[in-house]
Every structure is written in C-alpha cells, then in structure tokens.
Amino acid sequence: MATPQSIFIFAICILMITELILASKSYYDILGVPKSASERQIKKAFHKLAMKYHPDKNKSPDAEAKFREIAEAYETLSDANRRKEYDTLGHSAFTNGKGQRGSGSSFEQSFNFNFDDLFKDFGFFGQNQNTRSKKHFENHFQTRPDGGSSRQRHHFQEFSFGGGLFDDMFEDMEKMFSFSGFDPTSRHTVQTENRFHGSSKHCRTVTQRRGNMVTTYTDCSGQ
C-alpha cells in the first residue's frame, strides 16, 4: 500500500516531467506555425488562439496558463530582434540561468492587455469604435433574439464587409463568430412621390445587400 510520502514524491515527479515537456515546446509549436512563418502568419495564429483561450471567454481551469503561454510566444516571435535571438539560442536567450525569464523582461508589463488591444488591429468596427471598452464589444457579440434593440442593429449595419473582414487574414474570424441575432442584410431606401390622373402613387427604391450580393428593386403602392 502506498504511503502518503510516496504519493507526494510521485506527484512531484509527474509535475517536474510535465514542466520539462512544456519547456521543450517551442514558441512556434505553441502558436502552431512553422519556423519559416511570416509576421502575418504569426499574428493571425496569435489572435486565433488568444480569442480561444482568453480567461474572460474560456472558463476552463488551464485557460489562463495557456493564454499566458500563447502571449509569451507571440511577444518573442512578433519582435524581429527577439525572434532572431530565440532562433539562435532557444529559450535560454530569455532566461536568467535558473530556467526563468529575467526580471527585466517586458513580458510581465505587456501581458495584461484586454479585448480592445486584442482586436484593434483587425478593424472590426469603424475608426471611432476601436476605442470602445471590452464590455461594449461583448454586448455586440452576445447571442440575441431577433428582437434586439435598434441601436445594436445600427452597429451591425456598420460592420465592415468590404475587402477586409472575410479575406485570408480574417478567414478564421468568420468561422468563430456565429450568433443568431446577426443578419448581414443592409438596406438603403429612397422614397419618391409621383402624382398623375388625380391619383397618388408612392414609390421607393430599395437597395438590399446580402453578403457580397447587391440587388435593387422598386416598390410602389398607392390608390
């Protein structure tokens, strides 16, 4: 029968083995990119993983540790000089000789970023909307029934569909963001009034956009 002491020693051994395995995992492996990855590929991989594991969105016990690992990898690989050092010396380039990052590292200071910082480079909203808080962002992306407020619908109509959101840079974002309250239909109407033969007829031209398709038709009603 195992004694408490032997169980404790076994647990310590497992923990040490786990840490050794994690330590041997390269930053490229963490982000899931090849060593020859471009800056754009690295940035795209980071945003995808950061959104998946951010503690505010992912409530699993290991989400915070995973997110920190992802952020640390990105901090190094997104900087040309740091990446060059890492490619040459590996993890030892940023440790203090004890297997820990040096106290002078900027990682601790740069780690505490929020969703605004995470998405600001993606141009989700207009220029004025990039400065809005994380709560504002979450309110727009929560699942809502069709009876959402007109204010929220207005913002959805301002969503940028042209030449950016669904290109190769953001193809993963399209897959990750799905919510029932979203309708990519944008309508612009102009109403004109024509009178003839003593009757009144009201016509309006409706331009309707669904995805990348735009259709225009005239809707008339009257006596």
From Swiss-Prot:
One term of GO molecular function: protein-folding chaperone binding
Domain of life where this protein originates: Eukaryota
PROSITE patterns, per database record: DNAJ_1, DNAJ_2
List of residues that carry Phosphoserine: S133
Subcellular location: Endoplasmic reticulum lumen
GO BP terms, alphabetized: B cell differentiation; ERAD pathway; negative regulation of IRE1-mediated unfolded protein response; positive regulation of immunoglobulin production; response to endoplasmic reticulum stress; response to unfolded protein
Record-annotated J domain positions: 26-90
A single GO cellular-component term on record: endoplasmic reticulum
Free-text note on domains in this protein's UniProt record: The J domain stimulates the ATPase activity of HSPA5/BiP, while the divergent targeting domain is required for efficient substrate recognition by HSPA5/BiP. The divergent targeting domain specifically recognizes and binds to aggregation-prone sequences.
PANTHER family assigned to the protein according to its UniProt record, in alphabetical order: DNAJ HOMOLOG SUBFAMILY B MEMBER 9
Function, as annotated: Co-chaperone for Hsp70 protein HSPA5/BiP that acts as a key repressor of the ERN1/IRE1-mediated unfolded protein response (UPR). J domain-containing co-chaperones stimulate the ATPase activity of Hsp70 proteins and are required for efficient substrate recognition by Hsp70 proteins. In the unstressed endoplasmic reticulum, interacts with the luminal region of ERN1/IRE1 and selectively recruits HSPA5/BiP: HSPA5/BiP disrupts the dimerization of the active ERN1/IRE1 luminal region, thereby inactivating ERN1/IRE1.
Summary of subunit composition and partner proteins: Interacts with HSPA5/BiP; interaction is direct. Interacts with ERN1/IRE1 (via the luminal region). Interacts with DERL1.
Protein name in UniProt: DnaJ homolog subfamily B member 9
Organism: Pongo abelii (Sumatran orangutan)
Gene: DNAJB9
